[in-house]
Amino acid sequence: LKPVCGCSRLEEVDVRSMKRKALARQMAYMSQGAIPPSGFVVEDLVAFGRMPHQGLLRQWRREDEDAVEKALTQCNLCELRYREIDTLSGGQRQRAWFAMAMAQDTPVLMLDEPTTFLDIGAQIELLEMAVDLNRTQNRTIALVLHDMNLAARYSDWIIAMKAGEIV
């Protein structure tokens, strides 16, 4: 989306002026209801989060492996690492997407309705992981939630919107 006025800045830099790969090293994005390619297993999806750290001269390294392993462990996905994404429950699938964003290893995570289609237990589990990531690794987490009770419980700051306007 292009802003009607103003700009979005990250570390004093307009994000529109940043190259995609540079932005992806600073900010991970988890969209709502994302659909992985058919046949992807959990570990492959999580490893996809390391793409911004790859390049022509920099291929897969030990730190990439460590980031994937850490994300799988923190999201309780180690036992599911070889399962195809489309065989997982909704909560497991959301944890896999969250693990991919974690493996990207950025200072900022943007989560667009990460609790969509999840039962309350899975919602709380995912939000607890986000809070833990914020508190233990000092990562900024910005998320969109429609449940004001969850927003109040898990957020330090809340911006309420109605019809596309901040209220």
Q: How would you describe each model-predicted region?
A:
Residues L109-E113:
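Catalytic Walker B motif of ABC-type/P-loop ATPase nucleotide-binding domains
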Residues A47, R62-L80:
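Conserved ABC ATPase "signature" region
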Residues I158-V167:
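H-loop (His-switch) and adjacent beta-strand-loop-beta switch element
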Residues G6-D14, L23:
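Conserved ABC transporter NBD signature motif
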Residues Q59, E84-L88:
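Conserved ABC ATPase signature
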Residues I124-Q137:
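Helical segment within the ABC ATPase nucleotide-binding domain
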